[in-house]
Amino acid sequence: MSDLDIQIPTAFDPFSEANAGDSGAAAGSKDYVHVRIQQRNGRKSLTTVQGLKKEFSYNKILKDLKKEFCCNGTVVQDPELGQVIQLQGDQRKNVSNFLVQAGIVKKEHIKIHGF
């Protein structure tokens, strides 16, 4: 009875999809900008933008996003993912349209995750 194969449930990691592709195609996966939604509490949600090039000013992009969509946001420094922009609410489509119209990213290089 000691040979039982039991899987223990672990915490959900919303960034696990981005980390899964790092082993095989490191150069190809770095080209994408990932726009995700995370559920906070109740009906509240958080939109994260990850994978923008380092030469962009994250604070200027955040300032324009906050002004355009009338929401609050911040730039978070993650040890594995680098800088990540966080916005309040479900802003996935708005952010992807904004990044394409501003010429920051091409539409083919945006991946939208969530629900």
From Swiss-Prot:
The keyword GTP-binding does not apply. Keywords: Protein biosynthesis, Translation regulation. SUPFAM superfamilies: eIF1-like. GO terms for biological process: regulation of translation. InterPro entries: SUI1, SUI1_dom_sf, SUI1_euk. PANTHER family: EUKARYOTIC TRANSLATION INITIATION FACTOR SUI1. Belongs to the SUI1 family. Probably involved in translation. This is Protein translation factor SUI1 homolog. It comes from Sporobolus stapfianus. The lineage of its organism: Eukaryota, Viridiplantae, Streptophyta, Embryophyta, Tracheophyta.
